[in-house]
C-alpha cells in the first residue's frame, strides 16, 4: 500500500524536509551538493548547478537523507518535467532499513545539455508498506552514504 502525504510526514525520516516537496503520494527529492559526470566530481553546492551534456549520464546525490523503517520501501521515478526534456533515470528500489543520501543515475538522451540547479526537485519517491517487516533489512555496501558512492561491484 502506498503511503499518503500525512503518513510520509509521520513515518519516514527525511532530512532536510521540505513542505514544497511533499506530494499527495510521494516526496520530491532535490539535487544535493555533489554530482559525478565524465569521471569528475562536481561541487554542485558551490557551482549552484550541474550540467549534464547530451548523451551523457550523471550521478546525482540527493539533498535529503532518507531513513526507512524495516516495513517500508521506496520506489523512484524521474519528474515528468525532466522526462519531457529527454532525461531518463535508472533507480533501484530503496530497501527497507535504508539510511542515507541516495546516489541516483540520470541520462540525458536529448541533443541539448540539461541544467539542474542545486536544491531543484528532480526525482519523486513513493513509499510502500510491506505486509510485514523485512527479516533482513538493508545493511549493505551503501548504507549510511552521505556523499556520492561509485559502484562497489568487484
UniProtKB/Swiss-Prot annotation:
Its EC number is 3.5.4.13. It comes from the Archaea. Belongs to the dCTP deaminase family. DCTP binds at residues 79-84, 95, 124, 138. It comes from Pyrococcus abyssi (strain GE5 / Orsay). Pfam families: DCD. One of its GO terms (molecular function) is dCTP deaminase activity. Keywords: Hydrolase, Nucleotide metabolism, Nucleotide-binding. The gene is dcd. GO terms for biological process: dUMP biosynthetic process; dUTP biosynthetic process. It is an enzyme of class 3 (hydrolase). This is dCTP deaminase. InterPro entries: dCTP_deaminase, dUTPase-like_sf, dUTPase_trimeric. Homotrimer.
Amino acid at each position: 500500500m502506498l503511503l499518503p502525504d500525512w503518513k510520509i510526514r509521520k513515518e519516514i525520516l527525511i532530512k532536510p524536509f521540505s513542505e514544497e516537496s511533499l506530494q499527495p503520494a510521494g516526496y520530491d527529492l532535490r539535487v544535493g551538493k555533489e554530482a559525478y559526470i565524465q569521471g569528475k566530481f562536481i561541487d554542485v553546492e558551490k557551482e549552484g548547478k550541474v550540467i549534464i551534456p547530451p548523451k551523457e549520464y550523471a550521478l546525482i546525490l540527493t539533498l535529503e537523507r532518507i531513513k526507512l523503517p524495516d516495513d517500508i520501501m521506496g520506489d523512484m521515478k524521474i519528474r515528468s518535467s525532466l522526462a519531457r526534456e529527454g532525461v531518463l533515470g535508472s533507480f533501484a528500489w530503496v530497501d527497507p532499513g535504508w539510511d542515507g543520501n541516495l546516489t541516483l543515475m540520470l541520462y540525458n538522451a536529448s541533443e541539448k545539455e540539461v541544467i539542474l540547479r542545486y536544491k531543484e526537485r528532480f526525482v519523486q519517491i513513493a513509499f510502500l508498506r510491506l505486509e510485514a517487516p523485512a527479516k533482513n533489512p538493508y545493511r549493505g555496501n551503501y548504507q549510511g552514504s552521505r556523499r556520492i558512492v561509485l559502484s562497489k561491484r568487484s
